[in-house]
Structures are given as structure tokens and as C-alpha cells.
Amino acid sequence: MSFDISQFPVLAQANTPDELRQLPQAVLPQLADELRGFLLKSVGKSSGHFASGLGTVELTVAIHYVYNTPFDRLIWDVGHQAYPHKILTGRRERMHTIRQKGGVHPFPWREESEYDTFSVGHSGTSVSAALAMAVAAEKEQAGRKVVSVIGDGAMTGGMVFEAMNHAGDLHNDMLVILNDNEMSISENVGALNNHLAQLMSGRFYTTIRENSKKVLKGMPVIKEMAKRTEEHLKGMVVPGTMFEELGFNYIGPIDGHDVDALVETLRNMRNLSGPQILHIMTKKGRGYEPAEKDPIGWHAVPKFDPSTFEKPASKPSDPTFSQVFGKWLCDVAEKDEKLLAITPAMREGSGMVEFSQRFPKQYFDAAIAEQHAVTLGAGFACEGYTPVVAIYSTFLQRGYDQLIHDVALQKLPVVFAIDRGGIVGADGPTHQGAFDLSFMRTVPNMVIMAPSDENECRQMLYTGYCYKAGPTAVRYPRGSATGAKQVETMTALPIGKGLIKRQGQKIAILNFGTTLANSLVAAEAFDATVADMRFVKPLDVDLIKELAETHDVLVTVEENAIMGGAGSGVLELLQTLKLPKPVLQIGLPDEFIKHGAPDEIISELRLDAAGIEKQIADYLA
């Protein structure tokens, strides 16, 4: 599928940044309009991240127009906002394949394009990487410029300020563009402020500024007075004091949808020395009314027809595991005001919207700050509350030290509701929940549960809520649950005990999590026993011992990395019990899992019923 590029006559002339830089500046507003129109049609046909990219169209055009990319380094933080960048860097004709198996990567990816100078997916990494590239450019006297673009949401992460503090100390030449899209463009982002930004980034002003520093170096009292005067002038119209204190020269805020103002300001800033920050104000969903009104709802979209101004209605389906979790939260909070729920900026994705509305005093959004979210839970536990930290598997990686040092070490009863465990699909290797069982299993005092369906998920969450001897984790996948009938009555499960779901002979399949249905189907071909292990830690020692003594071969199945996962725990236990037994471990291989539809990936990894059956047959051959 491709579009008739003649509908976009200026964009047709700018398939690469080199071609873009050949265009007269006068046509850039039209290019931005066409780029936005192409993005609308492209994502409408393919699905993908949507609102953020609509907000960065003018910025993307201006950066590639002013800077000599890829020689000059451009780093996008996270990458949701980088679709226009992909369109302008030679990937326009393949944009309809984005997030699909074998298609364009959902985020900037070094292996995909020389214009993607740093692979991203998690937030807050761009400034650190940009600083390193700026230092390298100075060491090599390469003359290249370095630019990072970071959204205001990512600025809540401590890593960003660690990097900015270091950059202010090293004082290398670099530009950080703060894309502030949390509010509509305010009154001070107009002609006066754009003019001031261009003035303060211009050569005349900056030359006087730097020369004055040298002259006043020996006169500290007068130098301090001059500094305060400058800050007062800038402070009348700009909120940049914090960045100035970190050692950055702050310019802005300016209208991020005025491509001419962006070009002029970037031209002025391109040759400034030291760390610079340009604050621009944009609107998520710019140019598409439904996305402007509801940028969260239009953050990522399925295939849709832009002309209808609405997303297609969702097909009726079983509730998602996230919704099951959200309902459980509300059910418990109705009876216990000491239940507190914490999320690192994933309210919608984690199923917590209703809870946040009904129990606002028990709800805490820690923003994109996973380390803080985990330790916040630890602090609440110290004061007698029952904190539930709802977090995606991939983002728990960022709070691992806090999990160990602040929670498990102190045996604090924090419940971790770990969403997106296993394959998540289209967001690719930065977001697959491949490692949580492995890295949690090594932590003392942890109880780790893996439900096979939504009812077990509900009961396990309640088990964690009731358990006061230390931290617990309930790990469940993305997407629709299995359709199991939910039991409203909540009962705490016996810790470390599994269940036999099918009695067979010779082969025993020890299943961990929602692969149970596939394991049961595969078992039919071998008349195998199937156990729903439920607990990854502690393991059911008695059950594993019994299965090892009464079967010839054990098979472990999990949607987690094989290395260090639940199957590894079974092998370790068998060695401890001095029970040598052939064990086939089925799970995720020792590689980063690429993007694609979840069903496609599961099939390719042979974790569906047919794949599990084939792996067992191959092992027995």
C-alpha cells in the first residue's frame, strides 16, 4: 500500500533531509501541512502512535532544515513523537508497515537508519546520550552539532536532571529541545516571546553576554549584579531559572508550530557555545480535532478513517487483565481506605481510571519516575498502609535497585501488579516483558505469582494484599483475558502451592502463567500431566518432587526469558533434591524479541499450542 505522492507536491521533493535543505524556506509551512496530512493517512492505514507525532511536525521540519543530519546528531527521547522524522528520512514509502512484523520500527532504531543515532523506547535517555556525543565531537574536533528532543513528560525522570547537571558542569556544546505539550499555547508564547527568543539566541546578544563574563570575571560584585539583571529580564517572560541553575542557557518558550520562528531560532542557537535549552510549546494531536481534544485517547490508535473523525468501535471481548486489576482495586478500596495505588504515569494503560476517580485520596501518579514510585510504596508500607504499585514489566526494570534495597531488604509488604508480562507485540524489544521473572526470582523475601487466567489473577492480587511478611508480585500479560468465570469472593491462596490440571503419564508439563491453555492442548498429543504452578517463588517443592519421581520427562513452560526464569528455578530445585531428571525448558530465547503482532510472535517462538507440542516432540525424538 502506498499513497499518491502527487497529493503532497512539496513533501514529494523532500524524501531525505538533504532534499529538504534544498527547498526555499518560504515553502516550509506548506511542507509541514503536507507532512501532517501524510501522517494522518499513514497511521490511519497502519495503526500506531499518533497524537505525539502530529505535535512535532514543524519542529521536525525545522531541525532537519537547519542541522546537517545525519552528520549532526539528532536524538529523540522515547520516540512516540518521531514519526515525522521517519517520514523525512527515507522511510516514507514504508510507513504503512510501521509496528508490523518486518516493517518500520515503532521507535528510532540505529539498525534501521543512519538518521536514528540512538535507539530509544524508554523515556529520559536522550540527554545522557547527547552529552556523550557532544563530548566525543569535541574530542574529535569534528565540528558536528548534537540535538536531543525531549517531551515534558520525560522531564519528571531523575535521569534527565542527572544528565543536565553533568552537562552544565562539562559545558560542551549541545542543544536540548524541551517539547512542552501538556498545555495549549499560552498567551506569552506569541510575537513578543518569539522575538525575545530570537534576540537572546542571536549573535549580538550572546557575544556581549560572553565578553561581559570575561570582563567582569575579576569584579565579582558587579558580575553578580549583571547576572541578576539578566535573569530578571528573562524571568519577566520565561520560566527558565531552573535550567540556568543547572548550567544551561535557556531560550523560550516559543510557539512550536511556527516553523519560520523555529528555523530562525535554531539558526541562531546552532553556533552558541555550551549547553543550550530551547523550550517550545506544542499541542498533541495538532491539526486533527479529535486528537487535540483527547490526546491521551489518541496517543496510539488502531487503523481508522481520518475523514470520520472517530476511532472504530472496539469489538466486544473479554475484559483485559488490566481491567480485571482495576476492578479488583476498586473492590478492595471500598472496604479498606489504607489501600493505596501507585502508578508511574500509566493510569489508562494499567486500568486505573475508575479507581483514580472514585478514590482520589488513595491514588498516586508518580509520573515517569519508576524508581520514585517503588520507594514511595516502600515508605507507605512503613507507615502501615498497603501500597499496590501498578507497573509494566519493562518499566519495573528501571526500579530494580529500589525493589531490592528499599522493599525486599526491609521485608515491606508492597504489592507489585506487573502488567505487560511476556510478549506485548508492536512496541518491540524495548517493551517486551521478557525479564521480570528472571530478575525478581533472585531477590530474597519476594513472593512471585503468575496467574493462568483472570480469576486466578484476582485471587493472587488478594493473596498479595493479605500477605504481610514481605513484598509480592502478580505478573500478568497485556490484552484480553481468557474468558474464565470470575469468582467474586476473594480467597488468599496458600503460598507456594500449585494445582494438577490434567493427569497423564510419563511427561509432566509445569506451566507458569497464561500459557496454561496452550500447554493443556499440547498435552493431549502425549497424554501428559499438566500442572498450573501458580507460584514462581516459592516453588511448590512437594509437587515438583512428586512429578519428578512419577514421570520420565519434565517440561517447563513460561512466557519469560528461559535464562534465569521459572524453568531455571525448577532445575535448581531438582539439583538440590538430588533428583536428576530430563527437563525441557520452553520460553523466550536469549535474544531481544522484535516487533510484530503478539499472535505472530508467539507462533514464531513456538509458544502456541502447536509450537509447544512440536518442541516436546523434537526433544523426545
Curated annotation (Swiss-Prot):
EC number(s) per entry: 2.2.1.7
Cofactor descriptive note: Binds 1 Mg(2+) ion per subunit. Binds 1 thiamine pyrophosphate per subunit.
| Cofactor entry | Mg(2+); thiamine diphosphate
Q: Which residues bind thiamine diphosphate?
A: 80, 121-123, 153-154, 181, 288, 370
Keywords, A to Z?
A: Isoprene biosynthesis, Magnesium, Metal-binding, Thiamine biosynthesis, Thiamine pyrophosphate, Transferase
Residues annotated to bind Mg(2+): 152, 181
Q: What does the record list as GO biological process?
A: 1-deoxy-D-xylulose 5-phosphate biosynthetic process; isopentenyl diphosphate biosynthetic process, methylerythritol 4-phosphate pathway; terpenoid biosynthetic process; thiamine biosynthetic process
Q: In which pathway does it act?
A: Metabolic intermediate biosynthesis; 1-deoxy-D-xylulose 5-phosphate biosynthesis; 1-deoxy-D-xylulose 5-phosphate from D-glyceraldehyde 3-phosphate and pyruvate: step 1/1
- Annotated GO MF terms: 1-deoxy-D-xylulose-5-phosphate synthase activity; magnesium ion binding; thiamine pyrophosphate binding
- Entry GO CC: cytosol
Q: Does the keyword Methyltransferase apply?
A: no
| Catalytic reactions of this protein | D-glyceraldehyde 3-phosphate + pyruvate + H(+) = 1-deoxy-D-xylulose 5-phosphate + CO2
**Classification via Gene3D superfamilies:** 3.40.50.920, 3.40.50.970
| Subunit structure comment from the entry | Homodimer.
Recorded family membership:
Belongs to the transketolase family. DXPS subfamily.
Per its UniProt record, what NCBIfam families does this chain match?
dxs, PRK05444.2-2
State the protein's purpose: Catalyzes the acyloin condensation reaction between C atoms 2 and 3 of pyruvate and glyceraldehyde 3-phosphate to yield 1-deoxy-D-xylulose-5-phosphate (DXP).
Instruction: Write down what this protein is called.
Output: 1-deoxy-D-xylulose-5-phosphate synthase
Organism expressing this protein natively: Shewanella piezotolerans (strain WP3 / JCM 13877)
